[in-house]
Amino acid sequence: MAGKKVLIVYAHQEPRSINGSLKKVAMEELSRQGCTITVSDLYAMDFEPRATRKDVIGALSNPEFFNYGVEVYEAFKKRSLASDITDEQKKVQEADLVIFQIRNRQDGSDWSRLSQFPTRREGRETFPLYWFGMPAILKGWMDRVLCQGFAFDIPGFYDSGFLKNKLALLSLTTGGTAEMYTKTGVSGDFRYFLWPLQHGALHFCGFKILAPQISFAPEIASEEERKAMVASWAQRLKTIWEEEPIDCTPPWYFGQ
């Protein structure tokens, strides 16, 4: 939609990976719609994921005992946060939609050694293990950028969070197949896996959450299947601004 601004937070090491293709097609499709696209390529930026004393410029409010949350909150109010944090906060503040493009791996298995799955010798992707969570560099981005004062306050969270007029969407790839992420699958229902991130982090800051875009097991998929994953994402983006946010406190999560 013309005039909309989109931030893509990209957390993958290899530009030629399927995550790179998903990012590229998102940029192309949204640009065709007249959107302004900004990309934070965290690995290319060498983004610092650690939350440390260096995030506060100048004197601490309590030099005798360092409390990161308190000091960053005070630094935000005094405009004395490190520039890499404020640069990212500006990108978030200007965005109507934030897309998190990430690769998730759910265990330590080397899928290429399983004979029942086809392997691809050329252009094969290798990844760190993320253990049902986001890559450390993206976790660090959230820890440092979505700080108190900028993204939320007490009170001022969930539906009252400071980013309540923005949309967020997780676009991610997995190591396991779709069947593994079902209620009867070995890894469990994927909705439970994403709930802490979608609700506990993003919705806590006020984001309205769009349904995730999940590309299952591209590493063991055929070339045609991988192309279909990218095409499916491109097709969805054509009507992304018409989508309604998902319910972040659904009854199924609480066994109702």
What are these regions (language model features)?
Residues 7-9, 38-40, 99, 124, ...:
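Hydrophobic/aromatic beta-strand patches that form the interior of the parallel beta-sheet core
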Residues 180, 184-256:
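Glycine-rich phosphate/pyrophosphate-binding loop and the adjoining helix
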Residues 26-29, 146, 197-203:
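Short amphipathic alpha-helical segments
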Residues 2-35, 40-43, 224, 233:
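N-terminal beta1-alpha1 ligand-phosphate binding loop
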Residues 16-17, 46-49, 106, 131-135, ...:
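Short catalytic/ligand-binding loop motif for oxyanion handling, primarily in non-cytosolic enzymes
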Residues 45-91:
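Phosphate/nucleotide-donor binding subsite
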Residues 76-198:
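Helix-loop-strand module that forms the ligand-binding subsite of alpha/beta enzymes
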Residues 1, 73-75, 254-255:
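Aromatic-rich, lipid-facing transmembrane alpha helices and their immediate juxtamembrane interface loops
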